[in-house]
């Protein structure tokens, strides 16, 4: 009898925990994905803060020339970063227990892998949690689809690009100036500005900003008057009210006359789908572009493609980018013994004109 009661008590405790995890009445929804998300994001955040403040220099290039990224080694908020793991580690999984000592783990940039892997698992779980909450509330699943764009971008720079280049030392550093350094080196090595997928991403981000500003200003300019001149117009809206808070016909008429009729949406649902889809698709393409350039399928090369009648080069924007890229690549590779091959290449001397006969 006692055993039966203990089993029922244990079962009821587990059932109560399951109900709490999946309850939509909590102030913050946890969900089963949240059970994974919370510890991984906490681990990533704690390790990032400690490493950003106090991590010792990291031998990022694997040539015994450590690079300092933390605040106590002289950096500030702009220049500081969690430096990627060493090129000597490559793509090896490098948890603390794989190092001979904690000092070795820090010297080889172990905190970077800890932060990035926990962060990626955390944002994947956050995306799953968005779907899970939508499912519980009977909503459509497009919120997590929209969130997949920044998730894809993070996966591209932290996971796919290092895989393609053969080392986590090529991943994006976790800092402001480190991000800009990553962008400059990426342009130098892959000519990303001449890649059509990057162009689509620029159109997605800038276009999304433009459309967001246009939509917000149109709605704000066509609000239905509910207040006096001495009151804030925001008091004219009550949360959950059934009436439209702005006149979509007036907004449609204004914009249709400003541009042309069919440039303006007359359907609120299709309008908001467009506002969501435009930047999401653009960022998807950028992530796809970074993922393909990770394997050196680079941007278009139009260098020295225009010549005059006497065969002299007429420099174009492509040539300007190419010269800038060469300069950035020289600055990136600071050591003569690690000089960029496309800059150090000279005319080769053949060792043998034909293969020797065998036998």
UniProtKB/Swiss-Prot annotation:
It catalyses: 2 a plastoquinone + 4 hnu + 2 H2O = 2 a plastoquinol + O2. The chain crosses the membrane at residues 29-46, 118-133, 142-156, 197-218, 274-288. InterPro entries: D1/D2 (IPR055266), Photo_II_D1/D2_sf (IPR036854), Photo_RC_L/M (IPR000484), Photo_RC_L/M_CS (IPR055265), PSII_D1 (IPR005867). Chlorophyll a ChlzD1 binds at residue 118. A quinone binds at residues 215, 264-265. Residues 345-359 form a propeptide. It comes from the Bacteria. Keywords: Calcium, Chlorophyll, Chromophore, Electron transport, Herbicide resistance, Iron, Magnesium, Manganese, Membrane, Metal-binding, Oxidoreductase, Photosynthesis, Photosystem II, Thylakoid, Transmembrane, Transmembrane helix, Transport. It is found in: Cellular thylakoid membrane. Fe cation binds at residues 215, 272. The record marks 190 as: Stabilizes free radical intermediate. GO terms for cellular component: photosystem II; plasma membrane-derived thylakoid membrane. Belongs to the reaction center PufL/M/PsbA/D family. This is Photosystem II protein D1 1. It comes from Parasynechococcus marenigrum (strain WH8102). The gene is psbA1.
